[in-house]
Amino acid sequence: MKYMIPDEEFIRREGVPITKEEIRAVSIGKLNLNKDDVVVDVGCGSGGMTVEIAKRCKFVYAIDYLDGAIEVTKQNLAKFNIKNCQIIKGRAEDVLDKLEFNKAFIGGTKNIEKIIEILDKKKINHIVANTIVLENAAKIINEFESRGYNVDAVNVFISYAKKIPSGHMFLAKNPITIIKAVR
C-alpha cells in the first residue's frame, strides 16, 4: 500500500478542494488510526481524507452538504475501490447524533462550535480538525479546551520546488493548522 495517494491520482472538481498529500499525511498521523476505528469525516470535500482514512480503519462516514463534494467523493471512493464508507449528504450538526463512531476528522468548519458540542456530548475523545483560517484555529482550540480536551496544534507550511532558468525555487501553498484534541 502506498503511504499516501499522490494528489494527481484523485478525481478533482473545480470549486471542491482536496486536502494536499502532505497535509493528509500529517492529519492521518494525528488521527492515530487502527483497524477497529469507525471515523466520521465532517466536510469530506473531494474525498481525499475519506479515502485515506478508509484505507486504515474499519468504517468511515463522509458528510458534506454540497452536491459537488458528494459527487466527487463518490467518484474517488469508486476509483480507489473503497467499500467501507457511507456518504451522507447534509449538515454535520443535523446527522452526527444518529451515527456511531469513535474518532472524528473535521475538514469543514462551518458551525464548528455546534459540531464540537455534539462530538463532546457523544464522548468522542480523539478528534482532528484542519483549518486554513487563523480565526477558526483560535476558535477551535478554545472550544476544545473549554470542554476539557488536551489540544495539540501544528501549523504546516508546504512548499513545492519549481524549476526556473537559474535553478529551482520553492512556491509556498497556504499554511494549514492541524488541531488534535484528545482526552
Curated annotation (Swiss-Prot):
It is an enzyme of class 2 (transferase). InterPro entries: CbiT (IPR023475), Cbl_synth_MTase_CbiT (IPR014008), Cobalamin_biosynth_MTase (IPR050714), Methyltranfer_dom (IPR025714), SAM-dependent_MTases_sf (IPR029063). It holds the Pfam family Methyltransf_31. One of its GO terms (molecular function) is cobalt-precorrin-6B C5-methyltransferase activity. Its EC number is 2.1.1.196. Keywords: Cobalamin biosynthesis, Methyltransferase, S-adenosyl-L-methionine, Transferase. It catalyses: Co-precorrin-6B + S-adenosyl-L-methionine = Co-precorrin-7 + S-adenosyl-L-homocysteine + CO2. S-adenosyl-L-methionine binds at T19, G43, C44, G45, S46, G47, D64, A92. It comes from the Archaea. Pathway: Cofactor biosynthesis; adenosylcobalamin biosynthesis; cob(II)yrinate a,c-diamide from sirohydrochlorin (anaerobic route): step 8/10. One of its GO terms (biological process) is anaerobic cobalamin biosynthetic process. NCBIfam families: CbiT. Belongs to the methyltransferase superfamily. Archaeal-type CbiT family. HAMAP family: CbiT (MF_00786). This is Probable cobalt-precorrin-6B C(15)-methyltransferase (decarboxylating). It comes from Methanocaldococcus jannaschii (strain ATCC 43067 / DSM 2661 / JAL-1 / JCM 10045 / NBRC 100440) (Methanococcus jannaschii). The gene is cbiT.
